[in-house]
Curated annotation (Swiss-Prot):
GO terms of molecular function: aspartic-type endopeptidase activity
Membrane-related topology note: Multi-pass membrane protein
UniProt source species: Histophilus somni (strain 2336)
Keyword tags: Aspartyl protease, Cell inner membrane, Cell membrane, Hydrolase, Membrane, Protease, Transmembrane, Transmembrane helix
Transmembrane feature ranges: 9-29, 65-85, 97-119, 134-154
This protein's name: Lipoprotein signal peptidase
Family classification: Belongs to the peptidase A8 family.
Length: 165
């Protein structure tokens, strides 16, 4: 099989997401004290926090087993998505880009968790006293990837409906 005709060439996007995330986290850890916050806009701070759980600090208050669980989960999901990329055609650009972003984000957070025992988060959006959960570049990559997959699914559904009519 010619691998250039699969979704695997899109893995460069995973590498960009992975390294962008790790570089930004390194900059935060080197230049901020824990919980230090710098106001950027009236609704946005850079705030260094440590997330021992998953999205929205899910399971953060447990005894430490969740670190290994989330690392294994990220690896398993990444390998599954890698298989999807292998099976996809290179022409499935939206889906392949979404998958690649999700792999890069998942592996970046897993690497952070394996190295530190937690994930470094720093994007802090808020309105008055309400704060959205703090997140990082890897989280953005995962969410954009999931959004691209949703858009692709709707587009595929529209194509099927138009063929039936």
């Amino acid at each position: 099989m010619n691998l250039s005709k699969t979704g695997l060439p899109f893995l460069w996007i995973s590498a960009v997401a992975f390294f962008t995330d790790l570089i930004t986290k390194l900059a935060v850890v080197k230049n901020f004290s824990l919980y230090e916050s710098v106001n950027i806009l009236p609704f946005f701070n850079l705030t260094y926090v440590r997330n021992h759980g998953a999205a929205f600090s899910f399971l953060a208050d447990h005894a430490g087993w969740q670190k290994y669980f989330f690392i294994l989960l990220a690896l398993a999901v990444s390998f599954m998505i890698l298989f999807f990329l292998y099976k996809n055609q290179a022409t499935q650009k939206l889906q392949n880009t979404g998958y690649a972003l999700m792999i890069g984000g998942a592996l970046a957070n897993a690497a952070d968790r394996a190295y530190h025992g937690f994930v470094v988060d720093f994007f802090d959006f808020y309105w008055q006293q309400w704060h959205y959960p703090v997140f990082n570049v890897a989280d953005i990559a995962i969410c954009i990837g999931a959004g691209l997959l949703a858009i692709d699914a709707f587009k595929q559904n529209d194509k099927k409906e138009s063929k039936q009519n």
